[in-house]
A protein has these predicted regions:
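Signature of long, low-cysteine stretches enriched in small and polar/charged residues
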Residues: 46-48, 52-54, 59-65, 96-149
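Bacterial N-terminal signal peptides that target proteins for export
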Residues: 2-15
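C-terminal motif of bacterial Sec signal peptides marking the signal peptidase cleavage site
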Residues: 19-22
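Surface-exposed amphipathic alpha-helical segments
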Residues: 2, 39, 47-48, 91-107, ...
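Coil-to-beta-strand transition motifs
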Residues: 72-75, 136-138, 149-156
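Bacterial signal peptide processing site
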Residues: 24-26
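Secretory pathway targeting signatures of secreted, lumenal, and periplasmic proteins
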Residues: 42, 46-88
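Predominantly extracellular/luminal regions of secreted and cell-surface proteins
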Residues: 34-43
Length: 180
C-alpha cells in the first residue's frame, strides 16, 4: 500500500508549479534607460539592445535600439542623434515615410501626439496601423524629440508591434516614456 506521502506528491508538485507560474508574470515592467540622453522607458521584459544603420532619405543614420517581446507583442524604442533642429525635422519626416512605406497597404491613422518634455519641432506624432491581412499584427508608433544641451536633437521612435495579451500593456508602455 502506498504511503500517504507518495499519494500527495503529485498534488504538491502541481501546487508548486502553479506557485512558480504565479511568480513569473508575462509583463514584468521595469525602467530602462535608452541611449545617453536621459529617456527612461517602461519595458515589460528584459530588453535586448542593438545598433544599426537606418537609411533616412539620402543619409544613413546610426540608430540605437532597446526592446523585448512578451505577451504576443514586441515593445521597442529606437534613438538617433541629429546635429541640429533642421536635420532632426528632415530625419523624422524620412523616418515616418519609411515606416509608412514598410506598412504597405495597412489602414493607417496618423495624428499629433503629446509627451511631457518633448520639443514642439519636430512635433510628436502617433501612428496606428492595421495591416489588411487577416491575423496580421497591428502596429502603434510614437515619434518624439528632445533638445540636447549641445544644440543637437535626440529623435525617438517607440513601437508596439502586435496585440499584447494584456489590454492595457500598450498604454502602460507609451505612458511610461519619460524624458528628463
Amino acid at each position: 500500500m502506498p504511503s500517504s506521502d507518495s499519494r500527495f506528491r503529485p498534488a504538491l508538485a502541481a501546487a508548486a508549479a502553479l506557485a512558480l507560474a504565479a511568480c513569473s508574470p508575462t509583463f514584468n515592467w521595469r525602467e530602462v534607460p535608452v541611449a545617453d540622453d536621459g529617456l527612461v522607458v517602461l519595458l515589460p521584459c528584459k530588453p535586448d539592445r542593438a545598433n544599426r544603420a537606418l537609411p533616412l532619405g539620402v543619409e544613413s543614420v546610426q540608430v540605437d535600439m532597446a526592446g523585448c517581446e512578451t505577451g504576443g507583442a514586441t515593445f521597442a524604442v529606437a534613438h538617433a542623434s541629429a546635429e541640429s533642429p533642421a536635420q532632426a525635422e528632415a530625419w523624422l519626416r524620412a523616418w515616418r515615410a519609411a515606416t509608412r512605406s514598410q506598412l504597405g497597404e495597412a489602414q493607417m491613422t496618423e495624428a499629433p501626439a503629446a509627451l511631457k518634455r518633448a520639443i514642439a519641432a519636430p512635433a510628436p506624432v502617433r501612428l496606428d496601423a492595421q495591416p489588411p491581412q487577416k491575423g496580421a499584427a497591428p502596429v502603434q508608433v510614437l515619434w518624439f524629440a528632445q533638445s540636447k544641451k549641445n544644440g543637437g536633437v535626440s529623435l525617438y521612435q517607440a513601437t508596439v508591434l502586435g496585440r499584447p495579451s494584456a489590454p492595457d500593456a500598450a498604454d502602460t508602455f507609451f505612458e511610461g516614456l519619460r524624458l528628463p
